[in-house]
């Protein structure tokens, strides 16, 4: 099946409820807590996005990489067998947006390698042909633009971003 990822827009009340819940691991409460919230769903492409921005898998991110944090969240709330939760507080979103918007897309394109993506098994069990490299990169850039747009909306609304990756 694989793991899917999305970015949920969460208000202060809901995030505080989630963080204060100590009865069970956060992942046990995540679906109930996030039910009905607006979100950007990027399905199984979340690791493609991470790879396209950083050159590494989200399963093995470079320490203190600001582009990795733009995808995974500024703060790791839970990282385990059931999934991953990351949080970017509203006051951190402007810097995250600036970081993503300031990227040189041409430089990212030069660094992008479908051969490396296949070697790292970013999408396990699938080998992508080199003919798809441009199309795959364009898809990653589209997801990045959608993420920037979602982050802008969250910033305007005074909400926070919760990165959710579940299996």
Curated annotation (Swiss-Prot):
Pfam families in the cross-refs: DUF1877
InterPro entries for this protein: DUF1877, YfbM-like_sf
Entry superkingdom: Bacteria
Alphabetized SUPFAM superfamilies for the sequence: Hypothetical protein yfbM
Oligomeric form and interacting partners: Monomer.
Protein name: Protein YfbM
Lineage, opening ranks: Bacteria, Pseudomonadati, Pseudomonadota, Gammaproteobacteria, Enterobacterales
């Amino acid at each position: 099946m694989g793991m899917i990822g999305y970015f949920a827009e969460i208000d202060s009340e809901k995030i505080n409820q989630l963080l204060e819940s100590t009865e069970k691991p956060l992942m046990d409460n995540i679906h109930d807590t996030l039910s009905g919230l607006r979100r950007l769903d990027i399905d199984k492409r979340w690791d493609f996005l991470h790879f396209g921005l950083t050159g590494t898998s989200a399963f093995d991110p470079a320490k203190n990489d600001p582009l990795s944090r733009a995808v995974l969240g500024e703060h790791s709330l839970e990282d385990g067998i059931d999934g991953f939760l990351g949080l970017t507080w509203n006051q951190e979103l402007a810097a995250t947006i600036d970081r993503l918007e300031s990227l040189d897309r041409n430089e990212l394109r030069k660094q992008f390698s479908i051969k490396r993506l296949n070697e790292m098994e970013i999408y396990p069990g699938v080998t992508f042909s080199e003919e798809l490299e441009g199309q795959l990169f364009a898809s990653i850039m589209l997801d990045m633009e959608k993420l920037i747009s979602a982050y802008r909306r969250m910033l305007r609304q005074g909400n926070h971003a919760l990165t959710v990756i579940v299996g």
